[in-house]
């Protein structure tokens, strides 16, 4: 499949954002204090790496088959923090940072879905966008349980 100039530029943009997200989640997994959050960030880093691979395939003109449904099973969280602490402040910062990134990437996919002429590509991008929205929901759930989201 050949891409026009605009489609190529958008794929390059998406690839850069997915790489940034994967790297950020990996680093944040190392920095997080709560083991639940470390696990969540590690899981999200893996999923962002999968998104990066999908976008790389698209760049090469290969339209991958997407699995039906959304991401993996929804994680559940228990409160790790009661009251304020430096650890909670750090984990809150890491969550806020990644949640802002998910919002940005989701908006980028929202734009891209309408810019590609091939319906199969739009379906792939839409699938990834749904997973990005799930990531945001998981971050919100963790923050909410720990009194970090107001």
Question: Over which residues does each language-model region extend?
Answer:
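Absolute protein N-terminus
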Residues: 1-2, 150
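Alpha-helical scaffold segments that form or flank carboxylate-/histidine-based iron centers
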Residues: 2-13, 35-53, 91-95, 119-133
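Alpha-helical bundle segments that constitute or directly flank the non-heme di-iron/ferroxidase center
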Residues: 2-33, 88-116
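Arginine residue identity/basic-tract feature
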Residues: 27, 60, 67, 120-122
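Carboxylate-rich helix-loop segments that flank metal/cofactor sites and access channels
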Residues: 57-96, 100
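Preference for long, well-ordered alpha-helical segments
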Residues: 101-150
């Amino acid at each position: 499949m050949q891409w026009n100039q605009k489609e190529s530029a958008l794929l390059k943009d998406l690839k850069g954002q997915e790489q940034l997200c994967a790297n950020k989640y990996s680093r944040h997994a190392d920095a997080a204090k709560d083991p639940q959050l470390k696990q969540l960030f590690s899981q999200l880093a893996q999923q962002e790496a999968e998104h990066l691979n999908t976008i790389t395939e698209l760049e090469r003109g290969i339209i991958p088959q997407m699995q039906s449904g959304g991401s993996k099973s929804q994680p559940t969280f228990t409160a790790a923090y009661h009251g304020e602490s430096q650890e909670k402040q750090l984990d809150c910062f890491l969550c806020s940072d990644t949640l802002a990134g998910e919002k940005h990437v989701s908006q980028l996919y929202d734009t891209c879905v309408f810019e590609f002429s091939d319906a199969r590509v739009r379906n792939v991008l839409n699938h990834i966008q749904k997973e990005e929205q799930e990531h945001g929901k998981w971050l919100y759930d963790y923050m909410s349980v720990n009194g970090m989201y107001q």
